[in-house]
Swiss-Prot record:
Its cofactor is Mg(2+). GO terms for biological process: GDP-mannose biosynthetic process; mannose metabolic process; protein N-linked glycosylation. Gene3D superfamilies: 3.30.1240.20, HAD superfamily/HAD-like. Pathway: Nucleotide-sugar biosynthesis; GDP-alpha-D-mannose biosynthesis; alpha-D-mannose 1-phosphate from D-fructose 6-phosphate: step 2/2. The gene is PMM. Signal peptide: none annotated. The lineage of its organism: Eukaryota, Rhodophyta, Bangiophyceae, Galdieriales, Galdieriaceae. This is Phosphomannomutase. GO terms for cellular component: cytosol. It is an enzyme of class 5 (isomerase). CDD domains: HAD_PMM (cd02585).
Length: 251
């Protein structure tokens, strides 16, 4: 999708996208049709992505040239931020929280998961990222089929939301925020380090349209969807995202 960059026709507008469930099926690759549409959209407005995953996972889903293909790439909610292909900001969870508190949170999560009775458990239950922890009751290295089965199980048994409620009470004094996203996990980060964090890097753009699928209370798109600095659009799939953009931007 990479091409020589020209300024878009509308330099006052940014189309900012969540990744999982918005531009791609959860943890899967974007379709050629979606990527081609994003290329055309970038001729009209500035484009950007914001997600909880690190850059490596974003590249797996959207291609190895995403730093060239989008004007803004915000990994880990913008705690690792790129503008025009250049790294402009890195924030550290370990430095902010401190090793002792971080260790307490990780140990608590692992104990909770050890006692959790669910049909399947695999591996990588807590993933440490630069700006957050990603916690998965089933484990991140489950297969795609196991991922989908857990999502269905979680809808019925509220495994993640109950886990989050427990952690909120347990670490009330740590000023942490918990955000459920994707199919199998939730993120843990200091309050204010949700997706609205990335908006500080685009203050010069007056109109920001945000597109996301987890826009409900407790979802990881909720805060930025509700933020006064954005015009929020709730989507149900990559196809719905493209359709809404076509209507909005007359493409």
């Amino acid at each position: 999708m990479s091409h020589i960059r020209r300024m878009p026709k509308r330099t006052d507008t940014l189309a900012l996208f969540d990744v999982d469930g918005t531009l791609t099926p959860s943890r899967c690759k974007a379709s050629h049709e979606t990527l081609e549409f994003l290329r055309r959209l970038r001729d009209e407005v500035f484009t950007g992505i914001v997600g909880g995953s690190d850059l490596v996972k974003q590249e797996e889903q959207l291609g190895p040239t995403i730093l060239e293909d989008f004007d803004y790439v915000f990994s880990e909610n913008g705690l690792v931020a790129y503008e025009k292909g250049k790294l402009i900001h890195v924030q550290s969870l370990a430095k902010h929280l401190g090793e002792e508190k971080l260790k307490n949170v990780i140990n608590c999560c692992l104990r909770y998961i050890a006692d959790l009775d669910i049909p399947l458990k695999r591996g990588t239950f807590v993933e440490f990222r630069k700006g957050m922890l990603n916690v998965s009751p089933i484990g991140r290295n489950c297969s795609q089929q196991e991922r989908e089965e857990f999502e269905k199980y979680d809808r019925v048994h509220s495994i993640r939301s109950r886990f989050v409620d427990y952690l909120k009470e347990r670490f009330e004094g740590y000023d942490l925020q918990f955000s459920i996203g994707g199919q199998i996990s939730f993120d843990v980060f200091p309050r204010g380090w949700d997706k609205t964090y990335c908006l500080s890097f685009v203050k010069h753009i007056p109109v920001i349209h945000f597109f996301g699928d987890k826009t409900f209370l407790g979802g990881n798109d909720y805060e930025i969807f509700q933020d006064a600095r954005t015009i929020g659009h709730s989507v149900t799939s990559p196809e719905d995202t493209v359709k809404q953009c076509q209507q909005l931007f007359n493409l």
